[in-house]
Amino acid sequence: MASPEAPEHVVQFALDKLGGLDYLVLNHVGGAPAGMRARSAQATRGLLQAPPSSGSRPRPGLRLRPVTRGRCLQVNLLSYVQLTSRALPSLTDSKGSLVVVSSLLGRVPTSFSTPYSAAKFALDGFFGSLRRELDVQDVDVAITMCVLGLRDRAPAAQGVRGVTRAMASPGPRAALAVIRGGATRAPGVFYPWRFHLLCLLRGWLPRPRAWFIRQDLNISAAAAA
């Protein structure tokens, strides 16, 4: 998904092979490490910088390492938009569903995750707005936003090892929650369930919410990261 051309090719391949789409599950991300340095302007620029297309020449002095390309805006947001735009006509015909796998950090900001949280908030804003647009146009395409935490089999767990005390949830159970949410056309999925409470506390009781988040952080490890 780091290539601007890849999302359209992926959807077109699926349409050619399957003849149409009933579900589109978006579950990919270019991760960012947690820690004090992750909030720097340079780290954020690395996350949000789209890679040059295959037909363009990179600017002198600009070299995007593979790990940087994996964190770019193309992977974290634009590819989601491209995949959705290309698949939406087919999903409209089938009255299908969009399932967007996101993170708690796209609803509740926490410490030492500035670039990653920025990308996830952008996803929540885009698909929240798209849901409203489809509704007012009477387009019967469901959008399910999945708010997940750390999974024990996810690469993202390695990026926060030692920084957070939060326990990783079993990956298969998180996958089952996503499948159920998409199949039932639920507007939102929270796994573990307590994340729904944290999202509610964000507006109602910000101080207790901040206290809960702080308990899961290892400040000294984050400072050294």
Question: Which positions does each model-derived feature cover?
Answer:
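Active-site loop immediately N-terminal to the catalytic Tyr-X3-Lys motif
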Residues: 61, 108-115
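Active-site helix of classical SDR
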Residues: 84, 119
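SDR active-site lid
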Residues: 132-193
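Residue(s) in the substrate-gating loop at a strand-loop-helix junction
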Residues: 103
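Active-site Tyr-X3-Lys motif and surrounding loop/helix of classical short-chain dehydrogenase/reductase
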Residues: 9-16, 34-38, 42-47, 59-63, ...
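Conserved NAD(P)H cofactor-binding loop of Rossmann-fold oxidoreductase domains
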Residues: 27-32, 51-57
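Rossmann-fold cofactor-recognition segment
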Residues: 1-5
